[in-house]
Amino acid sequence: MSLLSDLINLNLSESSEKIIAEYIWVGGSGMDLRSKARTLPGPVSDPAKLPKWNYDGSSTNQAPGQDSEVILYPQAIFKDPFRQGNNILVICDVYTPAGEPLPTNKRHNAAKIFSHPDVAAEVPWYGIEQEYTLLQKDTNWPLGWPIGGFPGPQGPYYCGIGADKAYGRDIVDAHYKACLYAGINISGINGEVMPGQWEFQVGPSVGISAGDEIWAARYILERITEIAGVVVSFDPKPIPGDWNGAGAHTNYSTKSMREDGGYEIIKKAIEKLGLRHKEHIAAYGEGNERRLTGKHETTDINTFSWGVANRGASVRVGRDTEKDGKGYFEDRRPSSNMDPYVVTSMIAETTLLWKP
């Protein structure tokens, strides 16, 4: 195994200028990530200088067999923490050969919203809290839980320390460092309320980059859990009963909200979000009704509410924002399996472009 390890960790730059680019895209379910690699003649830092590529869309449920070619458009580059050196990860979106975005390409419409002059002028910032659950591969039962049984009730696990409270920290820390290496703006990690559940935060990131960074961070997490022989689940309620679900709380601010007097603008933005509650819920992730029950730090899926420091509300405003009269707010409705392109762009569209 040592020779295999040595070969995996070969430093290509010592013998060749060529690099490996791992092209990554979202598959037909809207949540499954796919990737494949190609050799390039030398280092690349600008996605516009990367070649387009194609793949068999009939094998990802994105095209029929008789017309299966789907085109990959490179959109964002990150350093590859697995191959290291000058090798890169490339976030792509997907198009037909005629240049039409596929239905699963949520980045295309998000980019249009973020490039709108009224949105771009407000420099929207996002901080996304991505929760996930680590599962034992052979049983699909949370890591650290007894097979067919349950751990002690929730309470000691949130930000917990110790072998009886924190399950999978090696995976979490490996992911944290790999994201920092890659150039993702990951801002922290913590153990969550349900044992075996964790969270990482990305941001503040501007506009479309928030979605690119979340998808890249998810890809890196999937690869690390693959190596560890563990399954990562983004299901919003992986275990029924008296256990917390998994969300992707999305923190948001605009230039106007961050300036003096911004609290009044925040309140107007939240009011607009309330008026479009049903539309947002429909776009905020599959299975969210199992999570948004009014229990376990959520509000009921059919009810919109907001409050200061209230983790049982749809939207939470922090004490500091209220005190300073400016800042940001947190949309607590998105589920852990949400598409970050959809959620971030929809919040911007509703608060900056939509007229009631």
Curated annotation (Swiss-Prot):
Q: Which GO terms describe its cellular component?
A: cytoplasm
Please give the name of this protein: Glutamine synthetase nodule isozyme
A GO biological-process term: glutamine biosynthetic process
Q: Which residues form a coiled coil?
A: none
Under which EC number(s) is this enzyme classified? Answer: 6.3.1.2
Assembly: Homooctamer.
Q: Point out the signal peptide segment.
A: none
**Superkingdom as given in the UniProt entry:** Eukaryota
**Where does the GS beta-grasp domain start and stop, copy by copy?**
19-99
- GO terms assigned for molecular function: ATP binding; glutamine synthetase activity
Q: What is the lineage of its organism?
A: Eukaryota, Viridiplantae, Streptophyta, Embryophyta, Tracheophyta
**Residues in GS catalytic domain copies:** 106-356
**According to its UniProt record, where is this protein located?**
Cytoplasm
